[in-house]
Amino acid sequence: MSAITPYDWAIIAFVIGVTFLCVFMLTVPLLLGGKSWGRAKQEQFESGVVSAGGARIRLSAKFYLVAIFFVVFDLEALYLYAWSTSVREVGWLGYTTVVIFVVDLLIALVYAFSVGALSWAPADRRKLAGEKIKVGSPTMNIAEITRFNSIEELVTDPTGQIPAQSSGRVKSKTTPALSSEKE
């Protein structure tokens, strides 16, 4: 069996340190934290107010497009950075590969622009501006599907109740039992 080298001791110390830190971070809150159980502890906390409906709202697809383009171009920048650090070692073959890569990216960018993937304007405004729409069904209105609902639309539903009232979690001001007794 071989002797343990200083490099091995460094790895062993690192593993022991990480294990101790994880155990410490998991046990200290259990020992110092308060313990109370009840129905109120299981509910969501929204600044002391009873939650009104779900927290999920529909966002415009524009934000997802920006996120996707950011990820794609960020990865491309990472690839170009890796190439730039080794430009002397890869020579002309590496240079040719990067030129093909960048040309391919530019072709993809021109294609995305030509099909309207980078346009934030709804299809109706593009029609009025004279642009010819090349992709999608003529009956499909993406702008209407992905439009952002205003806060006023999110607060009340068509019956005039807040979402929590329509779900039955919050009683309305006039309950059906009281209104039937008055009649």
UniProtKB/Swiss-Prot annotation:
The keyword NAD applies. Pfam families: Oxidored_q4. GO terms for cellular component: NADH dehydrogenase complex; plasma membrane. Disulfide bonds: none annotated. It is found in: Cell inner membrane. This is NADH-quinone oxidoreductase subunit A. The chain crosses the membrane at residues 11-31, 63-83, 98-118. GO terms for molecular function: NADH dehydrogenase (ubiquinone) activity; NADH:ubiquinone reductase (non-electrogenic) activity; quinone binding. Belongs to the complex I subunit 3 family. NDH-1 shuttles electrons from NADH, via FMN and iron-sulfur (Fe-S) centers, to quinones in the respiratory chain. The immediate electron acceptor for the enzyme in this species is believed to be ubiquinone. Couples the redox reaction to proton translocation (for every two electrons transferred, four hydrogen ions are translocated across the cytoplasmic membrane), and thus conserves the redox energy in a proton gradient. Its EC number is 7.1.1.-. It is an enzyme of class 7 (translocase). Keywords: Cell inner membrane, Cell membrane, Membrane, NAD, Quinone, Translocase, Transmembrane, Transmembrane helix, Transport, Ubiquinone. The gene is nuoA. It catalyses: a quinone + NADH + 5 H(+)(in) = a quinol + NAD(+) + 4 H(+)(out).
